[in-house]
C-alpha cells in the first residue's frame, strides 16, 4: 500500500508546491488539510479544489473558528495570557488547533506522516511537531522547507515547471500569520530593530494617532467567559470579532517587541490583536474586583508559566492541563460587567460591576460610613513586621 502524508495546507505557493514536492521526494500520496481559524482570505472550497489540482489525492477543509475561539482563545483570556507581558499568543494558540485536525486526518486516511510548512528557524516547527507527537506518538513529521531545502525560488521554479494553478509572483517582504485572535508581522525591514514600523504593515488596526470619537463598550463575563457586548449576548467568537472591529478602529492592540524565541534567538515581531487585548484587559480588571488576594497573587505566577508553555508548544502537556484546572477554578467568581473606553490606541477601564465583587464600599471609603476598624491596625503592623524587626536588631548591632 502506498504511504500517505497529511499536509497542513494553507492554499499558498509554498504548501501548494509541497504537495508535488513531497510526492517526488518520498513517493507518498498527499492528503491536504486546511483549517480555518479566522485568518480570512479565500473561500475554503476554492482552497480545497486548488489542493486537488496541485496533486493531492484527498483534500479536506475544516471551519474551526468557533472551536479555536472557545477551546484555545478562551483559555488564554481566562489566563490573561501575555507572553513576556505583551504578546497574546496569537500564532501559538492556533497551532494546537491545526495539529488536532491534522492528527485526526492522519487517522482517518491511514497516513503515517504529517507534514508542515515551517522553517527550521522558528517556533512553529516545535509547536507542530511537539503537538503531533503528543496526540500521535507513532506519527512521523516532515517539513519540506526545512528538510528538503525548499527555498521560495526553488518553489517558484517547481511551480512553473509543473504548471501548477497558483500565482508565482514574488511575495511581500514580510512574513505574515493571522487568525481571528490577531495578526503577526515579521522579517523585511523590521529585522533592523531601529526601524520604526510603517503604517502599511497594519490591517487589523487603524492609525491610533488619527483623531476620532472615542468608543465606549461594556463587556459582560460569566465565570471568566465573555457572554455579552453592550448587553447583547455573544459567543466567544463573536466577542472577539466585535472587539476586533471596534477596538481595531481605535488603534488598540498594536505591539512592537523583541521577543525570546524558543529556538534561542531574539526576534523582532509586530502584532495586531485588538480584540484579544481589549478582552484580556477587561477580564483582568474583573478579576481584580472578584478574586481573593492570595489567589490572585498566585494566579499571576500561573499565568506566566501557562503563557510560556503555550508559546513553547506544550499545549497538550500534563502540566498545561493541570494549570488549566487551576485557572478555571480561579475564574469561578469572575462574573460581572466591565465598561471600557476605546480611544487613541488604548483600552481604558472606566467602570466595574459585579454581584461577586469583593470590593466593600464601606470598608474602602474614607468618608462617613467607614466601617474599617483602624484601631486594629497598630497591632497588625507590629506582628506583621516582627520578623524583619528581630533580624534588624541582629544585623544593625
From Swiss-Prot:
GO MF annotation, one: ATP binding
Chain sites annotated for binding L-citrulline: 87, 123, 127, 175, 259, 271
CDD domains given in the database record: ASS (cd01999)
Chief site of localization: cytoplasm
A biological process term (GO) from this entry: urea cycle
Residue numbers binding L-aspartate: 119, 123-124
E.C. code: 6.3.4.5
Catalytic activity: L-citrulline + L-aspartate + ATP = 2-(N(omega)-L-arginino)succinate + AMP + diphosphate + H(+)
Annotated keywords: Amino-acid biosynthesis, Arginine biosynthesis, ATP-binding, Cytoplasm, Ligase, Nucleotide-binding
Pathway annotation from the record: Amino-acid biosynthesis; L-arginine biosynthesis; L-arginine from L-ornithine and carbamoyl phosphate: step 2/3
One GO location term (cellular component): cytoplasm
Localization annotation: Cytoplasm
Top enzyme class: ligase
Positions contributing to ATP binding: 8-16, 117
Pfam families tied to this protein: Arginosuc_syn_C, Arginosuc_synth
Disulfide bonds: none
HAMAP family: Arg_succ_synth_type1
The protein's assembly and partners: Homotetramer.
Family, per entry: Belongs to the argininosuccinate synthase family. Type 1 subfamily.
Protein name: Argininosuccinate synthase
Species: Streptomyces griseus subsp. griseus (strain JCM 4626 / CBS 651.72 / NBRC 13350 / KCC S-0626 / ISP 5235)
Lineage: Bacteria, Bacillati, Actinomycetota, Actinomycetes, Kitasatosporales
Amino acid at each position: 500500500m502506498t504511504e500517505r502524508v497529511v499536509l497542513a495546507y494553507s492554499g499558498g505557493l509554498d504548501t501548494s508546491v509541497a504537495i508535488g514536492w513531497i510526492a517526488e521526494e518520498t513517493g507518498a500520496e498527499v492528503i491536504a488539510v486546511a483549517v480555518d481559524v479566522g485568518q480570512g482570505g479565500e473561500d475554503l472550497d476554492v482552497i480545497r479544489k486548488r489542493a486537488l489540482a496541485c496533486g493531492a489525492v484527498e483534500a479536506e477543509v475544516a471551519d474551526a473558528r468557533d472551536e479555536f475561539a472557545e477551546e484555545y482563545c478562551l483559555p488564554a483570556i481566562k489566563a490573561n495570557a501575555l507572553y513576556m507581558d505583551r504578546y497574546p499568543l496569537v500564532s501559538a494558540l492556533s497551532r494546537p488547533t491545526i495539529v488536532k485536525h491534522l492528527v485526526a486526518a492522519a487517522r482517518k486516511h491511514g497516513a503515517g506522516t504529517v507534514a508542515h510548512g515551517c522553517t527550521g528557524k522558528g517556533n512553529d516547527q516545535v509547536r507542530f511537531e511537539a503537538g503531533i507527537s503528543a496526540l500521535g506518538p507513532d506519527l512521523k513529521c516532515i517539513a519540506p522547507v526545512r528538510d528538503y531545502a525548499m527555498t521560495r525560488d526553488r518553489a517558484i521554479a517547481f511551480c512553473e515547471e509543473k504548471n501548477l494553478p497558483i500565482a508565482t509572483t514574488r511575495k511581500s517582504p514580510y512574513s505574515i500569520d493571522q487568525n481571528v485572535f490577531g495578526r503577526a508581522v515579521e522579517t523585511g525591514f523590521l529585522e533592523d530593530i531601529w526601524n520604526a514600523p510603517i503604517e502599511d504593515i497594519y490591517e487589523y488596526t487603524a492609525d491610533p494617532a488619527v483623531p476620532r470619537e472615542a468608543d465606549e463598550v461594556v463587556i459582560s463575563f460569566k465565570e471568566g467567559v465573555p457572554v455579552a457586548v453592550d448587553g447583547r449576548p455573544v459567543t466567544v467568537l463573536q466577542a472577539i470579532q466585535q472587539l476586533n472591529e471596534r477596538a481595531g478602529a481605535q488603534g488598540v492592540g498594536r505591539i512592537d517587541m523583541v521577543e525570546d524565541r524558543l529556538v534561542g534567538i531574539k526576534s523582532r515581531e509586530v502584532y495586531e490583536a485588538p480584540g484579544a487585548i481589549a478582552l484580556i484587559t477587561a477580564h483582568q480588571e474583573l478579576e481584580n474586583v472578584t478574586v481573593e488576594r492570595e489567589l490572585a497573587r498566585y494566579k499571576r505566577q500561573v499565568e506566566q508559566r501557562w503563557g510560556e508553555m503555550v508559546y513553547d508548544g506544550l499545549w497538550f502537556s500534563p502540566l498545561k492541563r493541570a494549570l488549566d484546572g487551576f485557572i478555571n477554578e480561579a475564574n469561578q467568581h469572575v462574573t460581572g460587567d466591565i465598561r471600557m473606553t476605546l480611544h487613541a490606541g488604548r483600552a481604558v477601564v472606566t467602570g466595574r460591576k459585579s454581584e461577586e465583587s469583593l470590593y466593600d464600599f464601606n470598608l474602602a471609603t474614607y468618608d462617613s460610613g467607614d466601617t474599617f476598624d483602624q484601631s486594629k491596625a497598630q497591632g497588625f503592623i507590629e506582628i506583621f513586621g516582627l520578623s524583619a524587626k528581630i533580624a534588624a536588631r541582629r544585623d544593625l548591632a
